[in-house]
Curated annotation (Swiss-Prot):
Secretion signal, residue range per the UniProt entry: 1-35
Protein name as it appears in the record: Endoglucanase 8
Organism (species): Oryza sativa subsp. japonica
One record GO biological process: cellulose catabolic process
Family matches, as Gene3D superfamilies: 1.50.10.10
This protein's GO CC annotations: extracellular region
Major localisation: secreted
Positions annotated as glycosylated: N298, N462, N469
UniProt cross-references to PANTHER family, sorted A to Z: ENDO-1,4-BETA-GLUCANASE
Keyword annotations of the record: Carbohydrate metabolism, Cell wall biogenesis/degradation, Cellulose degradation, Glycoprotein, Glycosidase, Hydrolase, Polysaccharide degradation, Secreted, Signal
Annotated GO MF terms: cellulase activity
Length: 501
């Protein structure tokens, strides 16, 4: 299997630079239209299914409310090698490893979604499901962060895991444990986990004891990340943080300031933190997310030399094709394309940030400024809708890239649990034969991975619905976590996406 780095072929310098330049053309295939010619889909159905995918990724003992009937308890001895309980959490994608960095980013973005789109999720009757998805992650983090300056960051040996194609309920592969501490730091993972726990503490404020536990742990993790600075490369080559840890430190401090309003975090944000204008928001690069959050607070970086709003604007200007500063490649069919391999994550992350930032801009009554060109919030919403619609079916192939949704949805997601039939408990899997039995055959998966958004088409809008083509067909938790907000907005606000004040 190809490593799932979101930054294949990039180095730190390239990651900090604004990415790629290209021409945009609108997609011509519109499976359904409403007045004005805009595509329309059953966004409520897509929302419900997108959340269900996260349930299919759960590790640990599943609750009675489990809606994915082909899933069962798994990883029930996780942590046993160190006499700790590390059951729970999420498998990131199509394998059976729990990676700390993408897992934490998934939870952070879910928590932001739960707050920014609370009204819409409540109206769609999905808020409780999103809360449950968040808590499934935070309960795991509380187990992983029991000691000061220490965090369990990964469960499972990815190299051994990738030699066996088996559902998590029957995996025979070692559940190797990985940790960071003051001797082996990992500022990216510690800070991202702090961000996840802080944002979640805000979501669960009505449960004061639980919220307090999350926030207290988050403060310690942020201090750990800041005091013992260093990059952890133990998740390489699968989740290498090519962008470094400055973005996670700013991101975590932003959430801590929002949660506590303590001056110590404002001082760090304004004077110590490093912030850069980039054209990507992902599990590895958080600058635009922090900048959007800080724009509403009218905060500045570098001792007041630069406005976070101007940096958030730069992100928008680099993405939109009709600004003088656009730098992001867009496929002939209209999809953002940063790189092959889970490219859909950039589609959903951009759509999410554009809707969230548009709401903020309307509240502060300001446009995006791209040099002398003013871009109104409505343009961001229009582009966000186009990106989500592309995944749902408004693309040159006229097909859905969401399992179980729309026209001609994918049937072969690159996913062990979905492609392996339900096996009896204790079934002894022959790893050497597992690929020929369940991976190689060209047939639909026996279990529907409902709501999974595929890695997506390539830069030419080409897509191969084959299990072996992981760059196209492997889903990831963070692709879906970032789709939930825009889908909720489309389902409840309607196609113009404008929130009622």
């Amino acid at each position: 299997m190809k490593p799932r780095s979101s930054r294949d072929g990039h180095n730190a310098a390239a990651a900090a630079a604004l990415l790629l330049a290209a021409l945009v053309l609108s997609g011509d295939v519109l499976p359904a239209v409403v007045a004005g010619g805009a595509p329309s889909f059953n966004y409520k159905d897509a929302l419900t299914k997108s959340i269900m995918f996260l349930e299919a990724q759960r590790s640990g003992k599943l609750p009675p409310t489990n809606r994915i009937k082909w899933r069962g308890d798994s990883g029930m001895e996780d942590g046993k090698l160190a006499n700790v309980d590390l059951t729970g959490g999420y498998y990131d994608a199509g394998d059976n490893v729990k990676y700390g960095l993408p897992l934490a980013f998934t939870v952070t973005t879910l928590a932001w979604t739960a707050m920014a789109f609370e009204k819409e999720l409540k109206a769609a009757r999905e808020l409780e499901n999103v809360h449950a998805a968040i808590r499934w992650g935070t309960d795991y983090f509380l187990k992983a962060a029991t000691k000061k300056d220490h965090l369990w960051v990964q469960v499972g040996d990815p190299n051994a895991d990738h030699q066996c194609w088996v559902r998590p309920e029957n995996m025979p592969t070692p559940r190797t444990l990985y940790q960071i501490n003051d001797k082996t730091p990992g500022s990216e993972i510690a800070a991202e986990t702090a961000a996840a726990m802080t944002a979640s503490s805000m979501v669960f404020r009505k449960d004061k004891p639980y919220s307090r536990r999350l926030l207290n742990k988050a403060k310690l993790l942020f201090q750990f990340a800041k005091t013992h600075q260093g990059t952890y490369d133990g998740e390489c080559p699968f989740y290498c943080s090519y962008s470094g840890y400055n973005d996670e430190l700013l991101w975590a401090a932003t959430w801590l300031y929002l949660a506590t309003k303590r001056q110590v975090y404002a001082d760090f944000i304004g004077h110590e933190a490093i912030s850069s204008s980039v054209a990507e928001f992902s599990w590895d690069l958080k600058f635009p997310g922090a900048q959007v959050l800080l724009a509403e607070l009218n905060m500045t970086s570098s001792g007041g030399l630069q406005s976070f709003k101007s940096q958030a604007d730069n992100f928008v200007c680099a993405v939109l094709p009709d600004t003088p500063f656009h730098q992001v490649s867009i496929t002939p069919g209209g999809m953002i394309h940063l790189r092959d391999g889970a490219n859909s994550q950039y589609v959903t992350s951009t759509a999410f940030l554009f809707v969230a930032y548009s709401d903020i801009l309307r509240r502060i009554n300001q446009p995006v400024m791209c040099g002398a060109q003013a871009v109104q919030p409505a343009r961001l919403l229009q582009f966000a809708k186009q990106q989500i619609d592309y995944l749902l079916g408004a693309n040159p192939r006229g097909r859905s890239y969401v399992v179980g949704f729309g026209v001609n949805p994918p049937t072969q997601p690159h996913h062990r649990g979905a492609s392996t039939p339900v096996l009896p408990p204790g079934y002894q899997v022959n790893c050497g034969m597992s690929f020929s039995e369940w991976f190689t055959p060209d047939r639909p998966n026996p279990n529907e991975l409902t709501g999974a958004i595929m890695g997506g088409p390539d830069g030419g809008d080409n897509f191969s619905d084959k299990r072996g083509n992981s760059s196209c067909t492997e889903p990831c938790t963070y692709i879906n976590s970032l789709s939930i907000g825009p889908l909720a907005a489309l389902a409840i606000r309607g196609p113009n996406l404008i929130a009622t004040q």
